[in-house]
Amino acid sequence: MTPDRTLHPSRRTLLRLSLGLLALPGIGRAASLRSEPLRIITLFQGASDSAVALGVTPCGVVDSWSEKPMYRYLRPALAAVPHVGLETQPSLEDIVLLKPDLIVASRFRHQRIAPLLEQISSVLMLEEVFEFKRTLAMMGAAMNRQQQAMELLGQWQRRVATLRGQLQTKFAGRWPITVSVLDIREDHIRSYLPASFAGSVLSELGFAWTPAAREATGVSLKLSSKESLPVVDADLFFIFQRADSKAAQQNYDKLVQHPFWQQLRAPQDKQVWRVDAVAWSLSGGILGANRMLDEITQVAMADSAS
């Protein structure tokens, strides 16, 4: 029998990203010649998540968006790591003092300070903060952790395939069902789109999207009034409150009593699922994405939302 030399999708992804990475100034040389552990600073949440997943403890991280100073799920690994400010405004002085070998940044957040970062250290500059597979693969290549990254991507694809099959069984005859991801804020609702972090995971699982979500651009839609609720009407809702405040909870309490809400399919069918805002909206990495799968698995195993 001739051995199958076809690259697994995760291997192809990692190889393509790794080759692109080696073309970046300084990165390929640092990764290939350095044998001791890199001193790495991560300037966005998904990079911190990915470093932990790869078994690397950064020498510096930025503050989390909530559950400050660091998300609870990352605290066991990062509790003792120094902080270098906010994701949107990292402290260059603190970064210099930590003497990093590699800074992982995002063009979306850090384009303006990129020339200054490059004077401090080699910089791995990713485009977005929520493309978790690309972040994982590129960081794995930059830190000589290609094998670990490949294994994590393979585990992810196997888990997605299994969960997709469970969802197809649960919603037999109706699959793919439509989905909306709703963030209940103090004075409005955000509906996350296929291009968002959560949206990319749901699309990979095979969920369908509402017409409004398919036609929209960007990562979210803002619904300023309850009268806009029919726009997000879907078979299943995943909802969370990114702002953990009394005002956001009050808005949610009013929302579920509104006649328009009660006429939507998901509430009528008891398919409204409360999920973790950090995992679904703020984590941006492979560990956070797997926490999403944990919660979606509950949907596949249950008859209705509690």
Stretches found by the model and what they are:
Residues T217-K246:
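Ligand-binding pocket segment of bilobal, Venus flytrap-like solute-binding proteins
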Residues L38, I239-S306:
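Structured C-terminal subdomain patch of bacterial secreted/periplasmic proteins
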